[in-house]
Swiss-Prot record:
It comes from the Bacteria. Residues 1-72 form the S1-like domain. PANTHER family: TRANSLATION INITIATION FACTOR IF-1, CHLOROPLASTIC. SUPFAM superfamilies: Nucleic acid-binding proteins (SSF50249). The gene is infA. This is Translation initiation factor IF-1. It is found in: Cytoplasm. Belongs to the IF-1 family. Pfam families: eIF-1a. GO terms for cellular component: cytosol.
């Protein structure tokens, strides 16, 4: 079984939600709900409102995603 193709988009964190989830506004104007990737949690990388992040999303559900990088 092949791994599904993930779409990556840059965005800005708009709001912090419970359980390490965030409301992210993508550069194309859409807002999604995203959670932090496990490696970011493990390395205790903090994400705050206003941070620029990279979000990867599955092609099946374009309303949810995973934050896999925080830009410096």
């Amino acid at each position: 079984m092949a791994k599904e193709e993930m779409l990556e988009f840059p965005g800005v964190v708009k709001e912090l939600l419970p359980n390490a989830t965030f409301r992210v506004e993508l550069e194309n104007g859409h807002e999604i709900i995203a959670h932090m990737a496990g490696k970011m949690r493990k390395n205790r990388i903090r994400v705050l409102a206003g941070d620029k992040v990279q979000v990867e999303m599955n092609t099946y559900d374009l309303t949810k995603g995973r934050i896999n990088y925080r830009f410096k």
